[in-house]
Amino acid sequence: MSGSMATAEASGSDGKGQEVETSVTYYRLEEVAKRNSLKELWLVIHGRVYDVTRFLNEHPGGEEVLLEQAGVDASESFEDVGHSSDAREMLKQYYIGDIHPSDLKPESGSKDPSKNDTCKSCWAYWILPIIGAVLLGFLYRYYTSESKSS
Ligand code: HEM
């Protein structure tokens, strides 16, 4: 009966109220994946989890498309449709938490720029052998033409 679970923002007025966002709930992908029915339907858009159960029959795009994305990452499909900013605003109502950081794909690339690095080195891997081959070609021609002329 201690009741000491009250949130800090309820009474705290000592100027430290900026950390409200720390109370984010994290869900694992496997938990979201279980909510894939008409009874309970969650989906993930850009690393955020949305409970769209009560939105199903309100969705202008139909409940079928939502069911197809049930329990999985729907970011791509959501973007492909080109949803309006109104639609994006609506997302907030259904937001229930974030995907656990260790389940996040390196999609947003801010933490893991290794994709760019690989691309850069890809380029180097391509260009170096080509430069080598061209140089060898020139050397070969230089030597063969020299031996012809003398
Ligand atoms: C919670 C997430 C979603 C919300 C709040 C939402 C909201 C909306 C809204 C408001 C519209 C009307 C058009 C607009 O304003 O852009 C719409 C249309 C549509 N949505 Fe969604 N949507 C969501 C998720 C999805 C997903 C995951 C798909 C998967 C493919 C999808 C497919 C569509 C389609 C195909 C239309 C077009 C309907 C038409 O043009 O006739 N939506 N959605």
Curated annotation (Swiss-Prot):
GO terms for cellular component: endoplasmic reticulum membrane; intracellular membrane-bounded organelle; membrane; mitochondrial outer membrane; nitric-oxide synthase complex. It is found in: Mitochondrion outer membrane. PROSITE patterns: CYTOCHROME_B5_1, CYTOCHROME_B5_2. Heme binds at residues 59, 83. The modification N6-acetyllysine is found at residue 34. Gene3D superfamilies: Cytochrome b5-like heme/steroid binding domain. Residues 1-20 are annotated as: Disordered. InterPro entries: Cyt_B5-like_heme/steroid-bd, Cyt_B5-like_heme/steroid_sf, Cyt_B5_heme-BS, Cytochrome_b5. Keywords: Acetylation, Electron transport, Heme, Iron, Membrane, Metal-binding, Methylation, Mitochondrion, Mitochondrion outer membrane, Phosphoprotein, Transmembrane, Transmembrane helix, Transport. Residues 24-100 form the Cytochrome b5 heme-binding domain. The keyword Amino-acid biosynthesis does not apply. The modification Phosphoserine is found at residues 23, 37, 84. The chain crosses the membrane at residues 123-140. Disulfide bonds: none annotated. Cytochrome b5 is a membrane-bound hemoprotein functioning as an electron carrier for several membrane-bound oxygenases. PANTHER family: CYTOCHROME B5 (PTHR19359), CYTOCHROME B5 TYPE B (PTHR19359:SF95). Belongs to the cytochrome b5 family. This is Cytochrome b5 type B. The gene is CYB5B.
